[in-house]
């Protein structure tokens, strides 16, 4: 276990599926950097600073996990972090084609950077940040899909605090 890995994503917000993969990656690698992307093509509900703070709170129990916001190319961020592995999650076959293209592009840009794919636990296989936000936006209970810190942050952000 000598390898430094990066688990990149938008994490808007972090879900139980993300946490499942982070916990498993933390067992596989010496150090895991959660790279929270400031992706200008997406319009996140939470600011980069809010996402970094939420992910820090949710992963505080993992000693070998660090949370860092970044912008720019992922391969450049990986070099800065001295990481040799990208951890990516595959929820369904529909994720595979995009992830396959992304892995090949990253390999072209940085031949020493390997992509490793983890599948979520069955109970998390359908959870996505987009679905969680949609349920929360319509007043649904998302507590079974996200950490209590995230439930509270979503309620505050969406002004759906219930009495």
UniProtKB/Swiss-Prot annotation:
GO terms for biological process: coenzyme A biosynthetic process. Substrate binds at residues 10, 42, 74, 88. The record marks 18 as: Transition state stabilizer. Keywords: ATP-binding, Coenzyme A biosynthesis, Cytoplasm, Magnesium, Nucleotide-binding, Nucleotidyltransferase, Transferase. Its EC number is 2.7.7.3. Pathway: Cofactor biosynthesis; coenzyme A biosynthesis; CoA from (R)-pantothenate: step 4/5. Belongs to the bacterial CoaD family. This is Phosphopantetheine adenylyltransferase.
